[in-house]
Amino acid sequence: MQRNGVMECSVCHSKVVAPSPRSVSRAYDKHRSKISSKYRALNFLLVSGDCILVGLQPILVFMSKVDGKFQFSPISVNFLTEVTKVIFAIVMLIIQSRKQKVGEKPLLSLSTFVQAARNNALLAVPALLYAINNYLKFIMQLYFSPATVKMLSNLKVLVIAILLKFIMRRKFSIIQWEALALLLIGISVNQLSSIPDGTKSFGLAVTTIAYIYTLIFVTVPSLASVYNEYALKSQFDTSIYLQNLFLYGYGAIFNFLGILGTVIFQGPESFDILQGHSRATMFLICNNAAQGILSSFFFKYADTILKKYSSTVATIFTGLASAAFLGHTLTVNFLLGISIVFISMHQFFSPLAKVKDDKPAGALEPEDAQNHRSSDSSFVNMTAGAADDASHLTSTDERKPLLPI
């Protein structure tokens, strides 16, 4: 339980100072500085898998449409995806619990589950935002081609960087901000003349509706990703599968509420969550589940910026695959935009672009110094009190022991 910046254990009632966003960021930076070649290989596998899964996602969505429309409810796909991820998290928890050493706190105990649920309650926020975003993914396919959707999603990098700066106190160099500006230029180049003029939908110009959905499509998942990263890293010692169980459980609840809302407005016949599904939608559900699981590893062991930049690499795969299988044309604007995006990515992750810490290694920030001084003063008061008690006991009865026997 957290009150006034202090966390209290529900078991032993001990109190510690709650981690601030900046302290979470510093703790992660310290963990990252000790990263080994094994973790670097893990990051490479995560990026490779993410490129394939993210690249396949819009293509599977496009293949799921019949005559340009979805015969199934997008909310049902999101619900089945969350259920799939919950099952995966439970299976991995069982496997991990069987590999625990003697003396370790059991993962499947009720006390561990309840305590972890309290500590990870913040995961409900990104779960709700993800539920909204997953529905927007289907809406975006009605206005843009798969390759264009992937390019639009790259706009999230800039929004994520801004949110990381204010929420997690992350620092970016001028070169990295310039790299993000290059990313926006590359996306803008790809978007030139990408939407036909004069097309109407819902009585408005398609460009107007598309831009409104794009704004929501970029902001909502960016906020979800940053909050997800903060929630996972703030409880770094908690098993990622246990955290995923809460995250996906919340997501399944929110999507089920969406299904109930659909039943209220469209009638009981819409409650059939398997209605209109095909083999393509089953692949889509598996792809979305695998993509969400990979994202959790990115957020906990890497960072959100790397996750979004890895998604830009998937744009090439998406563009080539959509041109080969769906007949979409790769324009000059698209090729130029991709080139600028890769220049931006190289510049952002260049060693010269890293932020240099001006403070000495042993220096403390004001917040840390204050906590350090308060700890020292508390220790002095504690030792002084102990000395007073000792002198009091000695004057009363020198033969009486200080500690109970």
Curated annotation (Swiss-Prot):
Is Cell cycle tagged as a keyword?
Answer: no
User: What is one cellular component GO term in this UniProt entry?
Assistant: Golgi membrane
Q: What is this protein called?
A: CMP-sialic acid transporter 4
> GO molecular-function annotation terms?
pyrimidine nucleotide-sugar transmembrane transporter activity
The gene coding this protein: CSTLP4
| Segments on the Lumenal face | 65-74, 143, 193-203, 266-281, 344-405
Extract the ranges annotated as region (Disordered): 386-405
Can you tell me which family this protein belongs to? Belongs to the nucleotide-sugar transporter family. CMP-Sialate:CMP antiporter (TC 2.A.7.12) subfamily.
Entry-linked InterPro entries: Nuc_sug_transpt
**Membrane topology label:** Multi-pass membrane protein
Alphabetized UniProt keyword annotations: Golgi apparatus, Membrane, Sugar transport, Transmembrane, Transmembrane helix, Transport
Q: What Pfam families does UniProt report for this protein, alphabetically? A: Nuc_sug_transp
Subcellular location field: Golgi apparatus membrane
Q: Report biased composition (Basic and acidic residues) as residue ranges.
A: 389-405
Q: Which residues lie on this side of the membrane: Cytoplasmic?
A: 1-43, 96-121, 165-171, 225-244, 303-322
Transmembrane stretches, start-end? 44-64, 75-95, 122-142, 144-164, 172-192, 204-224, 245-265, 282-302, 323-343
What is the role of the protein in this entry? Sugar transporter involved in the transport of CMP-sialic acid from the cytoplasm into the Golgi. May transport important nucleotide sugars such as CMP-Kdo (2-keto-3-deoxy-D-manno-octulosonic acid) in physiological conditions.
